[in-house]
Amino acid sequence: MVGIVNYNIGNLASVLNALVKVGAKAQIEKEPSRLLEYDRLILPGVGAFGDAMEHLVQSGMKEAVLEFAKSGKPLLGICLGMQLLFEKSYEFGEHAGLGLLEGEIIPFDKTRMGEGYKIPQMGWNRFYAKKKSPLLKGLEEGFYLYYVHSFHAVAKREEDVLGESVYGYPFVSAIERDNVAGFQPHPEKSHDVGLRILKNFCEIG
């Protein structure tokens, strides 16, 4: 069973619908005490980093998600959910994250991007795998995923980087370390390729 963390922010219904499409048993969970009952967990999210962390703390989900990660079961962050896995973000100030991955979240650097690039990045972009992973099983190199974001991750450990994309310059588009992984793009909005990623996640372990 896949648990989708409900902390009053995020694209919960679209993630649930995508999981149902790939044949997974899944449900939205708002009770922190129940997270460990699930085989795997998805942390979705849209909006501002600081607000999201505040919701996680107030709902009691922060400690529950950290406990789940320690259990060794698969945990997947999507979009803002991926960003929350890192140590901190510089979105509208400086905010501490969950600290499950080493690195930080920064805004796209307009001085490096050149002309013609709008922020947020919104639309399809190519994904370049940086290492092998069960999450990418059955996918050919250079596939496209759907992105909506103004900030991106900078990982301290190169070996944690699962994939990169280019928007003016290369940035981390997916991360994976042990049982914790994240995608900056939205698999649930990325048609067959995105559904394959979610299916792969459901088959890990």
UniProtKB/Swiss-Prot annotation:
Residue ranges of every copy of the Glutamine amidotransferase type-1 domain listed in the record: 1-205
Record keywords, A-Z: Amino-acid biosynthesis, Cytoplasm, Glutamine amidotransferase, Histidine biosynthesis, Hydrolase, Lyase
Leader peptide range in chain numbering: none
GO cellular component terms given for this protein: cytoplasm
InterPro entries with a match to the protein in the record: Class_I_gatase-like, GATASE, Imidazole-glycPsynth_HisH
Pathway this chain belongs to: Amino-acid biosynthesis; L-histidine biosynthesis; L-histidine from 5-phospho-alpha-D-ribose 1-diphosphate: step 5/9
Enzyme active site: 79, 186, 188
Assembly and interaction partners: Heterodimer of HisH and HisF.
Full protein name: Imidazole glycerol phosphate synthase subunit HisH
Gene label: hisH
